[in-house]
UniProtKB/Swiss-Prot annotation:
Pfam families: ABC_tran (PF00005). InterPro entries: AAA+_ATPase, ABC_carbohydrate_import_ATPase, ABC_transporter-like_ATP-bd, ABC_transporter-like_CS, P-loop_NTPase. The complex is composed of two ATP-binding proteins (AraG), two transmembrane proteins (AraH) and a solute-binding protein (AraF). It is a peripheral membrane protein. This is Arabinose import ATP-binding protein AraG. The lineage of its organism: Bacteria, Pseudomonadati, Pseudomonadota, Betaproteobacteria, Burkholderiales. It catalyses: L-arabinose(out) + ATP + H2O = L-arabinose(in) + ADP + phosphate + H(+). The gene is araG. NCBIfam families: PRK11288.1. Keywords: ATP-binding, Cell inner membrane, Cell membrane, Membrane, Nucleotide-binding, Repeat, Sugar transport, Translocase, Transport. The keyword Signal does not apply. It comes from Ralstonia nicotianae (strain ATCC BAA-1114 / GMI1000) (Ralstonia solanacearum).
Amino acid sequence: MSAFLEFRGISKVFPGVRALSEVSFGIECGRVHGLLGENGAGKSTLLKILGGDYQPDGGQIAVEGRPVAFPNARAALAAGIAVIHQELQTVPELTVMDNLLLGHLPSRGGFIRQGEAMAWTRAQLARIGVDLDPKARLKHLSIGQRQMVEICKAILRDARVIALDEPTSSLSVRETDILFRLVKDLRAQGRALIYISHRLDEIFALCDGCTIFRDGRKVADFRSMADVTREQLVAQMVGRQIDDIFGYRPRAPGDVRLRVEGLMGPKLAEPASFAVRRGEIVGLFGLVGAGRSELARLVYGADRKTAGTVVLDGEPIRIRAVADAIRQGIVLCPEDRKEEGIIGCRSVSENINISCRRNRRPGWGGFNLFVDDRQEAKTADHYIARLRIKTPHRDQPIRLLSGGNQQKAILARWLAEDGMRVLIIDEPTRGIDVGAKNEIYQVLYELAERGVAVLMISSELPEILGVADRVLVMSEGRIAGELPRAQATEHAVLNLALRPRRDPCVAAQAA
């Protein structure tokens, strides 16, 4: 069968970097084709060219054998091509209904027919099996729910080609199951699908074949997933063999560095108490909605606590705002990198140095009022090299970097900060390739070996089991249990994560 969609010698150059170099391959109708590669390999750039966001510097796209050009995203949609980017394209202030029908709202005489729009939205969401309130504003939804809105929008446009870039990175288990069903239904309908994921289990479960990128070039093409093993995929992606992605390095933890006692906030069901020792990596696991990120934000001062105490190195401390936590040496790498972790319009150097107090020079009154540009450049170059951040230069806007390199820059920000005592890192490797994951784990081990207490939040259970010295499990807004590494099996952790909260009335009757 001839390819429905073809990439013919696609090249793209940005200042200082060649993102794509003469990439050619095709996709047939009724197939799911995987795209694999490390962060910065060029996968997302190719999808942005397909979706009309970027224009190629060389080569062409062909649909049914005819060359096409998409000057913008609207032209691509009109041609039946929908791209779901890793960075969501939704409007937070609008409702689910408004986002799904944006640009297509039914109207008469200049007025939107709200009743018809609402009925259509409810019917379509029910048809594809997604449980969302059409009236809910997206800013009040979780990242995973917003991702489902983006996916639904592409499906409801009846696109002939649908490209998905890391679609499950923010989804719950149930939402992932819904997505898998939708992808299989679309394949059965004869649509052509492109699927980018760093989760190799998903690639083997969904894709018929795959193409592998490395450094902007196509390095391998597999017609059938039966022709390749997981180990071969990883070796092709990173250009080297990775035997153990986690590379766990055992340590002997020291005294308790962070102790949380009876911490309570609006989104927790019960007061939370736990401790993290010097040189220890504690994994915090729970299903979506369990309260993991909410607990971290309370410790960090991003949300206001209603009760409880935070004790650091044996001394109770007062954290009323994020600045208080940072001054005490408690730092956070947030779950939502784009919205909370980076300043997209600023350079890599500025994002690394934004909290680095040692790069300030004293001004009037002895206050550190002035930025030492030379020292900032030196700091940025040091951590770009140390963490292997792929960027043409330190002044590159950070929004142009891949998700994995953005995460490394956020880590570099706190590595550059003197006096870090506690690192809270939320979803450290979400949307990140195998090679970059291994590098980030090594950084966490190095920090622990320096005596930093690390609290690692992750929804990926293998990551928790592979990296953590001890595991805390949350369920329904409370800490459901704690397991040492030797006892932390998938069965034991999930048993705690799925354990329902005991009804106080039932507990009283039992007593």
